[in-house]
Amino acid sequence: MDKELKEHGKELRERICQFITNYTATHSYAPTIREIGEGVGLKSSSSVHSHLTQMKIEGRIETKPYCSRAIKVIEKEE
């Protein structure tokens, strides 16, 4: 069960990355935490924040402190 939760978290973080990328391309600015939640089906802003924190640790996104629309997806180098 723990492995399933980890996989679900990875899939959700991938969806969050994709949502941020698509939203930014469409609007020319990043989404808020609430908009991300609405976009990926999470009701809790705290859950979105937790996933964003994990994504920062993994090096998948950058943020600016105290800025609500300052999330940047870091493209993976292959």
Regions flagged by a language model, labelled:
Residues 9-13, 27, 32, 64-78:
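Short, cationic-aromatic polyanion-contact patches
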Residues 38:
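Alpha-helical residues within the helix-turn-helix
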Residues 34, 53:
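Residues within the helices of the helix-turn-helix
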Residues 56-64:
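A short, conserved structural fragment
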Residues 42-43:
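The short coil/loop that forms the "turn" connecting the two helices of the helix-turn-helix
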Residues 47-48:
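Helix-turn-helix DNA-binding helix
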Residues 20, 52:
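DNA major-groove recognition helix of helix-turn-helix
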Residues 1-19:
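Short alpha-helical segments that sit at the start of domains
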